[in-house]
Amino acid sequence: VAGYQAYLYKQLNPGVGVRENIDTWAWRPDKLNNQLTPLRGKPQIQFTQNWPRLDGATAAYPIYASAFYALSVIPEDFHVWDYLDNSRTQEAYNKIVNGDADIIFVAQPSDGQKKRAEKSGVTLLYTPFAREAFVFIVNADNPVNSLTEQQVRDIFSGAITNWRTVGGNDQEIQTWQRPEDSGSQTVMQSQVMKNVRMISPQETEVASMMEGMIKVVAEYRNTNNAIGYTFRYYATQMNADKNIKLLAINGIAPTAENIRNGKYPYVVDAFMVTRDNMTSETQKLVEWFLTPQGQSLVEDVGYVPLYPTMK
């Protein structure tokens, strides 16, 4: 279904776009020239049974998939998909609440996700393991290179509607949003907009096996008047595109150094989310990610580590 929806969307919306999904086959050890990141040194822990079930956000998959394959001793009849999934933030939160995942690698939860966990009587633990930047993207030909925090809020609340107002061309601003409960939308609402109401998102229709054509939040389209948002790692490594540029905020670019020193305004933590009654194997993996070897993997994949790495 997802493949057909993607095909249909491309037919209805030709041109360059950014879709927050990936081909997980690129992160398999049996694929030639795979994109898995190796550990520094021999694995300091290994799993031979009772493997933790991992899931999470699209942008976190390279981290937890690389860890899974590096730390697991996998028998021949092993069904990897029972333990390694990428159902994205919204569904990953549902799975951890329902007990169908042991660790999910995600951004902070939305208010709705917190309430659903509370309603289910589930206590979730949030362990930060990496630092990331929430970034704003525009067409590379857009003359605007930086916005202030207030200008960002004004654009996405509808108070500013023309690029000329912020030093750009005399063009209407086309804003693109992310679906409710996605990691990007949660950060946008909580850390960027704060209490300012956003304008309604653009929508598109896609095919649903159950309901025919349904409306969903439209994906970013990189027209010369567009602005959208995502996470730095996704925009610069997983979906790098020379036709897209990242804006500075308050004149500060979202570089690794500015994430590390906290100067970039929208620095966020990536979390490992677990249930409070986690297994010993799950606890072992959570703790490993905070060790120098685990933090080195975080750094080598392309994130900013929170703790010391291996020399």
Predicted regions and their residues:
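Exported/periplasmic ABC-transporter solute-binding proteins
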Residues: V1-E132, I137-K311
